[in-house]
């Protein structure tokens, strides 16, 4: 009995002496990963991470039985079958640590350690311990896993363990999961203490939210059982770096759970959330190697996306350390104790007796602290205890004191405050002592602010304080009045604060400036413009234009000329026509009445025949005969016309016969009061010319017959209001044959634009001709047939016009046909060839439009040249072209202007060109073109334009037969309105140019055309037959233009174009015999869609820098060509030579160029389908680059230099490559074309300087080869084309003339055979350009269009059949 009592006493003494220590674990030496399960990557949740920790036990501080605990946050479990580890040194166990895995129960794992008897007071042991662990990165929707899912992120992390109040840590890099976070997420891990697995599945991501879905998993066999009592369902708003939910919220769903299946259905999950489920599952004893889970993932997203992604995944088996607990249930309980720490323990369990294993989580009683306050002098602390399961409360009551304040006045200079604390009571006393107050003085004064304010200035005790009231200055009312004195004066009346001051300005009367100008009315008027003080009043006297008297007189020269003598207002202008002394006959009949005058004139006809025989061996004869019959129009004007034909000598003889017949009827009425003219005109004419040329010699004979005929039928009606125009035209014609003629006409009434202009240039018949028809001006057609084909035309036009308002509905048609017969032989045995050429052309243009416009032409005065040209064209098939023009004056202070206009097929467009030149200091010109309806400038006057044209060409023989049968039908209605555009120029140089316009154009146009062209050519090497037909329709619904500072934007809503083509080509050469080609007609239309394009220009000037930038991009898709097959060879050689000479300073391409010009052009790659001359299908890719370099200046006049480099590459491809973009080269066929040009132009000129222009040769070569195309059964034997071109231009510029000589030689050869089938549509990306100048000019452009066409199945079938047939 005594022994038992002693043992109990020893036990209780030992318990009483044991204590809790800390700081045993001293360092975190390392944390490394070892892949122990063939995991895809080393994630923190995968086994095994090995932590190496340093420990130390000091016998003087620790005793056997003492305890210490290591807490490891975010550690999920220990990867070992051991339950504890010993801290051993030299084979001695100094402490034993037991593992407590957190798993799904706590957010941390821990080790509870007990010091063993091996430690004595004279021992200090230390060492390291290795712990195999895995971390918890989440995996279910429980609060423990949700909290631990936020412990770490991918990348560098700090892992910290705690031993009491001592912390040890290390850094580690955790890699991110490679699995996609947007797809189905599935996860499972073993819970060793429960001998179960937790299984998780997250639905695939729907960014816009889920409309509905089904999610779950099931067992494929009986190898696994689902614990339906542990299921969890939620939605999460995010996944961490390892695809684990970081939150869990409830939502509406329906669940179905059985031991073999766990499925939920859900609806209306908001965007940003994803459904997920988890549950415990238990592996059966038979599933030793693993088990399968079948995942269900069906979802319908809010944005219409749908998915059904089933998955079967095999999970390998995992064996835990509690293998002997088969059939026993595990219960997790929580017990609250009065200890201060949380612990996990497993109650004793005997599997042979007990049926339940109990894991007990021991938690301390929670405590909350409440702090209160009260009026008192001491602090109190009270504790409200609680039983286990409750919460204890600690109340801390903190005292505070109240205060009472006593204020008194004293003799000191400062304020003092003293606080007296009462140790026995809760009321303290504050004593405040303030000095006695000073007297105050108030003053009022003005200040610069806008509101009144008050400022107080205090001084020390026994002093005087000041109050300053600051008022804002009074408002001022200023009045200005005239007075009788000659000088200005100002009087100011001021008032006190809060009043109003007055300023009276007295000005003398303004001076007056009187100007006199012409106007369109028939009477004189005076207008007075007054301005305010210090201005200048204006008196404008407007006088009608002077009457003009025209006289004609003969003179001794052989050419005609016109002289105009103008006088000031109220005078009479004179026009003197000087004619050479020639034979003429005319008859004039005049009938007059009270209201109209009619006249008729019969022009005489004459013929001249001349023959000339030279002393050379070759004899040539010239016979010339012509007759004309031109009835004069019946119009309210007396007219006289004459025609003279003179003989001339020629180096080669020729015979020309021509007859001209025309009739012209005109009806018009005039009302002077309303200034309205209306007319209805009909004009028809026919011309037939026959010319024969022959030249006989001892060895060859050649005869040529040319027949040309045309007929014109036009109708138009005009309404003209407020017209006052005068035109004076003089023309001089000279040629090498020494024939000279002149024509002069003066007409006080000029008809308005008819908007249908028919013009033709028959330069092949007339070697040199100028045709400029216009309803606004007299028509002049000059032509000469000369064996040397050289002519000179000089004309002078003076124009003065006011506003025009017209409405017209013209209709016109034009028919022409021509034929050419030629027989030639060079020797009695040479070959003979016949050529027959005929053509016909008909045009019907029916536009209707309404136009209001006004224009004024400015004065040419010293230093500045300002010219404006206005024209309007409303015909789809019309073309208006004018040659280069230049103005010249004898006055040294007046400089020149060059201008060139070429307008073709414009619809509803008003165009004008404004040129400003400053020539006295070499600043160059600023040229701009813009749509406009009116131009106003500071000064207006007549403009004289002189044009000269010199052309030299060598006619070449041609052997061809061409038939052209076009038919064009168009209709158009449009209306336009626009504001005025103003141009402002100031100072002695062009400092600023302000351009502003707003225009709106609406139209409803439609145009259709039907064109048929066939051509036959016979030559010694073969014959070519070609034919084509074209049908097109176009419509433009609406177009709007808005412009500010020369900024333009326009849009075309729709454009449709359809075409058909039929081309048959046969080529026979001496080098290779070819077979006849057959081309299949493709009737499917092309569709083009245009997107809006924009154009903007911005001007800014600092008198030295001009910059311009142009960017453009367009996209066009074109249809493939039809299938063709050819075997061909082509050889071409041509030589061209031209010479041009322009008068002084009339060089249109150089004069208006700014100083120091730099232009950069870059063309991106392009691809398109097109037919070669051999009718093969070729898809090409091209890129070009041209870079003109900055010019260099050698004097203060003008210097211009340009360098250009170009490169082009073409790629040929088959039908499988239906889209080609920039920098792509198509396969399987290759085609290469290179164009290189490096011309350099340098021009420098002043009063006496000259410059030479040299350009290197330009060479272009094309080399194409076509291989076999895949998937289309194409055959190809290769196609090679070579084109070479060389240019050796030479230009010489003098101060008085510019001469340019151009020589060009072209050699081309094509040979080979090919067969190609239909290719698919491609995309063309065309040209991006950037330019910069050394003066202020910026231009941008952007646009795009696309087209798509697919070949018909019929064409594909026919092409395959044709391929096998050939």
Swiss-Prot record:
Residues 959-969, 1022-1040, 1085-1107, 1192-1202, 1209-1218 have a biased composition (Polar residues). A lipid is attached at residue 1345 (GPI-anchor amidated serine). Its main location: membrane. The GPI-anchor is attached to the protein in the endoplasmic reticulum and serves to target the protein to the cell surface. There, the glucosamine-inositol phospholipid moiety is cleaved off and the GPI-modified mannoprotein is covalently attached via its lipidless GPI glycan remnant to the 1,6-beta-glucan of the outer cell wall layer. Glycans are attached at residues 294, 596, 866, 1273. It is found in: Cell membrane; Secreted, Cell wall. This is Agglutinin-like protein 6. It comes from Candida albicans (strain SC5314 / ATCC MYA-2876) (Yeast). The gene is ALS6.
């Amino acid at each position: 009995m005594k022994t038992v009592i002693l043992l109990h006493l020893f036990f209780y003494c030992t318990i009483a002496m044991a204590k809790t220590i800390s700081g045993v674990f001293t360092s975190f030496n390392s944390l490394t990963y070892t892949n122990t399960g063939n995991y895809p990557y080393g994630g923190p949740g995968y086994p095994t991470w090995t932590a190496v920790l340093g420990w130390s036990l000091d016998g003087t501080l620790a005793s056997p039985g003492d305890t210490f605990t290591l807490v490891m946050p975010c550690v999920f479990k220990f990867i070992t079958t051991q339950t504890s580890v010993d801290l051993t040194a030299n084979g001695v166990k100094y402490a034993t640590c037991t593992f407590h895995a957190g798993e799904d129960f706590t957010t941390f794992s821990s080790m509870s350690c007990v010091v063993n008897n091996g430690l004595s007071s004279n021992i200090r042991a230390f060492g390291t311990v290795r712990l195999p662990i895995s971390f918890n990165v989440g995996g279910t929707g429980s609060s423990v896993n949700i909290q631990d899912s936020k412990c770490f992120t991918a990348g560098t992390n700090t892992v910290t363990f705690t031993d009491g109040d001592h912390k040890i840590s290390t850094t580690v890099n955790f890699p991110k999961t490679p699995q996609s976070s947007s797809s189905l997420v599935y996860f499972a891990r073993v819970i060793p203490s429960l001998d179960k697995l937790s299984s998780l599945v997250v639905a695939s991501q729907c960014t816009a939210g889920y409309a509905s879905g089904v999610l779950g998993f099931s067992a494929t066999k009986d190898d696994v059982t689902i614990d339906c009592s542990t299921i969890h369902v939620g939605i999460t708003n995010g996944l961490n770096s390892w695809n684990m939910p970081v939150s869990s919220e409830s939502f509406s769903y329906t669940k179905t759970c059985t031991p073999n299946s766990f499925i939920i259905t859900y609806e209306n999950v908001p965007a940003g959330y994803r459904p997920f489920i988890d549950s415990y599952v238990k592996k059966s004893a038979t599933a030793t190697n693993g088990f399968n889970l079948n995942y269900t993932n069906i979802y319908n997203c809010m944005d219409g996306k749908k998915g059904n992604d089933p998955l079967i995944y095999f999970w390998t088996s995992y064996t835990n350390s509690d293998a002997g607990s088969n059939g026993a249930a595990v219960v997790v309980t929580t017990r609250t104790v009065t200890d201060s720490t949380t612990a996990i323990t497993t109650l004793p369990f005997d599997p042979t007796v007990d049926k339940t294993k109990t894991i007990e989580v021991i938690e301390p009683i929670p405590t909350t602290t409440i702090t209160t306050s009260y009026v008192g002098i001491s602090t109190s602390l009270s504790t409200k205890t609680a039983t286990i399961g409750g919460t204890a409360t600690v109340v801390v009551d903190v005292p505070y004191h109240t205060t009472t304040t006593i204020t008194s006045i004293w003799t000191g200079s400062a304020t003092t405050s003293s606080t007296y604390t009462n140790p026995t009571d809760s009321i303290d006393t504050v004593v405040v002592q303030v000095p006695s107050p000073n007297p105050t003085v108030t003053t009022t004064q003005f200040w610069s602010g806008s509101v009144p304010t008050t400022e107080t200035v205090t001084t020390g005790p026994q002093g005087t304080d000041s109050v300053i009231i600051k008022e804002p200055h009074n408002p001022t009312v200023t009045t200005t009045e005239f007075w009788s004195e000659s000088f200005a004066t100002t009087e100011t009346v001021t008032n006190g604060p809060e009043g109003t001051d007055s300023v009276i300005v007295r000005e003398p009367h303004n001076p007056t400036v009187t100007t006199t100008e012409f106007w369109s009315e028939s009477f004189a008027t005076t207008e007075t413009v007054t301005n305010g003080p210090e201005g200048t009043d204006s008196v404008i006297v407007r006088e009608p234009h002077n009457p003009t008297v025209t006289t004609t007189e003969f003179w001794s020269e052989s050419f005609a000329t016109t002289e105009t003598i103008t006088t000031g207002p109220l005078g009479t202008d004179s026009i003197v026509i000087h004619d050479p002394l020639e034979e003429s006959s005319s008859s004039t009949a005049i009938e007059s009445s009270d209201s109209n005058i009619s006249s008729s004139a019969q022009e005489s006809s004459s013929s001249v025949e001349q023959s000339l025989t030279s002393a050379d061996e070759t004899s040539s004869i010239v016979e010339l005969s012509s007759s004309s019959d031109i009835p004069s129009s019946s119009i309210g004007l007396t007219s006289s016309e004459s025609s003279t034909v003179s003989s001339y000598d020629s180096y080669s003889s020729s015979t020309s016969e021509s007859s001209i017949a025309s009739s012209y009827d005109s009806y018009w009425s005039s009302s002077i009061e309303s200034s309205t003219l209306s007319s209805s005109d009909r004009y028809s004419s026919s011309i037939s010319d026959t010319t024969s040329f022959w030249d006989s010699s001892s060895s060859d004979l050649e005869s040529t017959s040319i027949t040309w005929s045309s007929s014109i039928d036009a109708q138009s009606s005009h309404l003209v209001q407020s017209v006052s125009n005068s035109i004076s035209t003089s023309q001089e014609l000279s040629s090498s044959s020494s024939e000279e003629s002149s024509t002069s006409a003066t007409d006080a009434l000029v008809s308005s634009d008819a908007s249908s202009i028919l013009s033709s240039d028959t330069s092949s018949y007339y070697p040199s001709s100028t045709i400029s028809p216009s309803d606004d001006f007299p028509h002049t057609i000059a032509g000469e047939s000369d064996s040397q084909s050289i002519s000179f035309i000089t004309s002078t036009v003076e124009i003065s016009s006011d506003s025009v308002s017209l409405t017209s509905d013209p209709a016109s048609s034009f028919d022409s046909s021509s034929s050419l017969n030629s027989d030639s032989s060079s020797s009695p045995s040479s070959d003979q060839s016949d050529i027959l050429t005929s053509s016909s052309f008909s045009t019907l243009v029916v536009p209707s439009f309404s136009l209001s416009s006004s224009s004024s032409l400015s004065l040419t005065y010293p230093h500045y040249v300002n010219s404006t040209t206005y024209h309007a064209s409303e015909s789809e098939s019309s073309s208006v072209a004018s040659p280069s023009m230049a103005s010249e004056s004898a006055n040294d202070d007046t400089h020149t202007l060059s201008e060139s206009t070429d307008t073709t097929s414009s619809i509803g467009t008003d165009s004008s060109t404004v040129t400003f030149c400053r020539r006295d200091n070499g600043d160059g010109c600023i040229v701009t073109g813009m749509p406009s309806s009116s131009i106003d400038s500071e000064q207006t006057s007549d403009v004289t334009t002189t044009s000269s044209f010199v052309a030299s060409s060598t006619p070449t023989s041609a052997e061809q037969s061409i038939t052209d049968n076009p038919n064009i039908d168009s209709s158009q209605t449009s209306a336009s309105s626009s504001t005025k555009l103003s141009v402002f120029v100031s100072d002695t140089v062009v400092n600023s140019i302000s351009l502003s316009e707003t225009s709106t154009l609406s139209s409803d146009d439609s145009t259709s055309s039907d064109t048929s062209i066939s051509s036959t050519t016979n030559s010694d090497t073969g014959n070519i037959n070609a034919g084509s037909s074209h049908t097109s329709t176009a419509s433009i619904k609406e177009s709007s233009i808005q412009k500010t500072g020369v900024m333009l934007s326009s849009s075309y809503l729709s454009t449709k174009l359809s075409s058909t083509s039929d081309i048959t080509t046969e080529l026979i050469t001496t080098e290779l015999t070819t077979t006849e080609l057959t081309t299949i007609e493709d009737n499917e239309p092309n569709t083009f869609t245009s997107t809006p394009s924009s154009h903007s220009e911005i001007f800014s000037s600092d008198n030295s820098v001009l910059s311009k930038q142009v960017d453009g991009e367009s996209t066009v898709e074109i249809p493939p060509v039809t299938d063709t097959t050819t075997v061909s060879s082509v050889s071409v050689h041509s030589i061209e030579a031209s010479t041009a000479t322009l008068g002084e300073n009339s060089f249109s391409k150089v004069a208006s160029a700014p100083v120091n010009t730099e232009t950069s052009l870059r063309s991106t790659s392009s691809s398109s389908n097109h037919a070669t001359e051999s009718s093969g299908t070729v898809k090409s890719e091209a890129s070009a680059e041209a870079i003109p370099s900055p010019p260099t200046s050698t004097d203060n006049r003008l210097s211009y230099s340009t360098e250009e480099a170009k490169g082009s590459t073409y790629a040929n491809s088959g039908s499988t490559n239906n889209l080609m973009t920039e920098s792509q080269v198509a396969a399987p066929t290759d085609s290469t074309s290179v164009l290189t040009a490096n011309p350099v132009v340098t021009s420098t000129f002043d009063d006496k300087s000259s410059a030479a222009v040299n350009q290197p040769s330009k060479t272009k070569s094309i080399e194409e080869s076509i291989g076999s195309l895949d998937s289309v059964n194409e055959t190809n034997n290769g196609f090679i084309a070579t084109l070479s071109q060389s240019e050796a231009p030479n230009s010489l510029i003098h101060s008085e003339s510019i001469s340019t000589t151009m020589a060009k030689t072209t050699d081309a050869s094509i040979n080979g055979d090919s067969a190609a089938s239909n290719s698919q549509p491609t995309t063309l990306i065309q040209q991006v350009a950037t330019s910069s100048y050394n003066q202020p000019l910026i231009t941008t452009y952007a646009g795009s269009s696309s087209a798509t066409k697919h070949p018909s199945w019929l064409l594909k079938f026919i092409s395959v059949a044709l391929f096998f047939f050939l």
